[in-house]
Structures are given as structure tokens and as C-alpha cells.
């Protein structure tokens, strides 16, 4: 998710205390790297200093990112901390490619800009970007580092909170962030009676839910649990939606035709094979489960 209120930060911190205690906050030291993926062959944005530049949206919200605000201009969380699922995955990929933590630089890139055509200010980007063929015309995607269901958030005590089917959602006012698979799911699968509301950011969509401008907000499942735990005090995860067709996946976003893409895929393959990704999911995303499936 993308601005939580300052008063809510203590709650957000509580969500990641257990993960920090289990050691999930550490960013790995550099290793030898992958044969054929030497730094000089990767076409890095900052090749002169052998720095890996990683893009992310700002604010950086849990459970995807963690750590207290420390490095400017990052808000809510700090990717440099290595805490949170996506920060941890990013540093794990960097490690596989032979980069130390000191050789990683984070840069702010708005979500919608990450997959637009044009020159990218990063070597790869990581902020819950789902692969789809249309986006892949403009950018490269890595293999999946997370396979995700969409979920819907309502408010406790409201009629939508008791809905138990997709068909039951049709009469409600639904909303999502522009350009997201969440919005696509509303349009293509739920097909509500009234046109869904679209917002430039998830923050704006959350505010609309709090203000009663929409009845339900569609987001990915881990984000739904963050919304209800931190941003909307009376929020409720009404349910999650099963996969339609192939399973939705989050992938790293890279410049179209990037020399880094094949090596990023090899790194992710290694992280699945050696159990790193599943362990990071256990540490950072274990709380984001349990919502009923709406059919």
C-alpha cells in the first residue's frame, strides 16, 4: 500500500516486531555471484561504481518494507533497512548477483511510472507490480517472487462486511488504484452495477473508504491486512478472490531489453530453490492469510 497517519505508525511497527525478532531484518552480505552475470555484463545504470540501483514507491508500506524512517526521502518505512518482504527479496537478489548492501542504492519511482515506456531510473523496481502482457510490452518482468490473490476491504458493521460471494458485491460502490490489477479485477470479474471509482494512489483510495465514498476497496491480500490493521480502524477483510486463469505474480520490473533480466531470473530461481523466498514469506507475510475465499 501506499500516507498512513503518524499515529498509526506504532501499530505498523507492531506488525513487524515478530519478524525482526526472528532475524528477518538482516540484509545479506555479498557472495560470489552467478557465472555469466559479472557486474560489467549487467548494463547497470551506474556501471562506473558497480552500484545496483533499485526503484520503489514512496511511502514504503509494511509488510512489503519495514524499519523506521531513517534515510531521506523514505516515508513510513526505509528500504535500506532490509526489513519487509520486498526489501528482503531485493537484497537477496542483490546478494545472488554479487552486490553487498553498501553497493545497493534505492531510488523513489511512483508505481505507475515503473511500467510506462521510456528510460528507467533504476536497474530493477520492486513494489507489488503484477505481470501482465500489456505491461510487458513496455518493460521486462522477472520471474515471480510472490504469487498473490486480490482481496476486498470493507468496514465493520456495514452491509458489505457480511457478503460471501462475488455476485453479492455487485451492488456496492467499489474502488481501487489506477493501473492496478485490483482495478482490473473489479472491472473484469466483479463487474459491479455502478462504475468503479479509480484513484491515483492507494492512499487516496483508503481515504475514500474511510470517508464512506466507496463501500469496498480491492487490493492484494497482504496489503488488505495492513489496511485493516493500521489505516482503517474499523476495516474488515471481507474476503479474497481465487486466481483467474494463471496465478497473478509480482515480478521485478526492468528496462525493456535489459541485460540484467536473464540474471535476475537466475537469481530468483536460486532463491526459490534454496528456500530463501519461502522463508522470507514465512517471516514477513505469515500474518496476511486466513481471509475467506469469495466465489
In which residue ranges do the predicted regions lie?
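Periplasmic-binding protein-like
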Residues: 146-154, 222, 229-269, 287-295
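C-terminal region of N-terminal signal peptides and the immediate post-cleavage residues
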Residues: 5, 16-34
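A structural signal for short loop-to-beta-strand junctions that line the ligand-binding cleft
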Residues: 41-43, 75-76, 128, 136-148, ...
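Bilobed "Venus flytrap"/periplasmic-binding protein-like clamshell domains
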Residues: 54, 59, 79-97, 129-133, ...
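A ligand-binding cleft/hinge motif common to bilobed small-molecule-binding domains
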Residues: 113, 129-138, 187-188, 210, ...
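Extracytoplasmic small-molecule ligand-binding "clamshell" domains
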Residues: 32-126
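Acidic, polar ligand-binding/catalytic clefts
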Residues: 102-168
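Extended ligand-binding regions for polar small-molecule ligands
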Residues: 30-35, 89-92, 96, 158, ...
Amino acid at each position: 500500500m501506499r500516507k498512513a497517519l503518524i499515529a498509526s505508525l506504532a501499530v505498523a511497527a507492531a506488525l513487524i516486531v515478530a519478524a525482526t525478532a526472528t532475524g528477518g531484518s538482516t540484509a545479506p552480505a555479498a557472495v560470489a555471484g552467478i557465472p555469466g552475470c559479472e557486474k560489467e555484463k549487467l548494463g547497470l545504470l551506474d556501471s562506473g561504481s558497480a552500484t545496483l540501483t533499485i526503484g520503489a514507491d514512496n511511502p514504503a508500506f509494511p509488510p512489503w518494507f519495514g524499519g523506521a524512517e531513517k534515510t531521506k526521502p523514505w516515508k513510513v518505512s526505509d528500504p535500506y533497512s532490509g526489513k519487509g518482504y520486498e526489501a528482503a527479496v531485493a537484497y537477496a537478489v542483490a546478494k545472488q548477483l554479487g552486490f553487498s548492501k553498501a553497493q545497493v542504492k534505492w531510488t523513489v519511482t511512483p508505481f505507475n511510472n515503473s511500467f510506462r515506456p521510456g528510460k528507467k531510473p533504476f536497474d530493477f523496481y520492486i513494489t507489488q507490480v503484477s505481470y501482465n502482457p500489456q505491461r510487458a510490452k513496455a518493460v521486462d518482468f522477472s520471474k515471480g517472487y510472490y504469487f498473490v490473490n486480490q482481496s476486498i476491504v470493507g468496514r465493520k458493521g456495514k452491509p458489505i462486511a457480511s457478503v460471501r460471494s462475488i455476485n453479492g458485491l455487485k451492488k456496492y460502490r467499489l474502488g481501487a488504484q489506477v493501473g492496478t490489477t485490483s482495478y482490473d479485477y473489479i472491472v473484469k470479474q466483479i463487474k459491479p452495477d455502478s462504475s468503479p471509482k479509480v484513484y491515483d494512489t492507494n492512499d487516496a483510495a483508503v481515504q475514500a473508504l474511510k470517508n464512506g465514498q466507496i463501500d469496498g476497496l480491492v487490493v492484494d491480500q497482504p496489503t488488505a491486512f495492513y489496511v485493516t490493521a493500521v489505516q482503517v480502524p474499523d476495516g474488515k477483510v471481507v474476503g479474497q478472490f481465487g486466481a483467474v486463469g494463471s496465478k497473478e505474480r509480482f515480478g521485478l520490473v526492468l528496462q525493456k531489453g535489459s541485460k540484467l533480466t536473464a540474471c535476475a531470473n537466475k537469481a530468483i530461481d536460486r532463491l526459490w530453490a534454496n528456500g530463501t523466498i519461502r522463508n522470507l514469506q514465512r517471516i514477513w507475510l505469515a500474518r496476511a492469510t486466513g481471509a475467506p475465499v469469495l466465489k
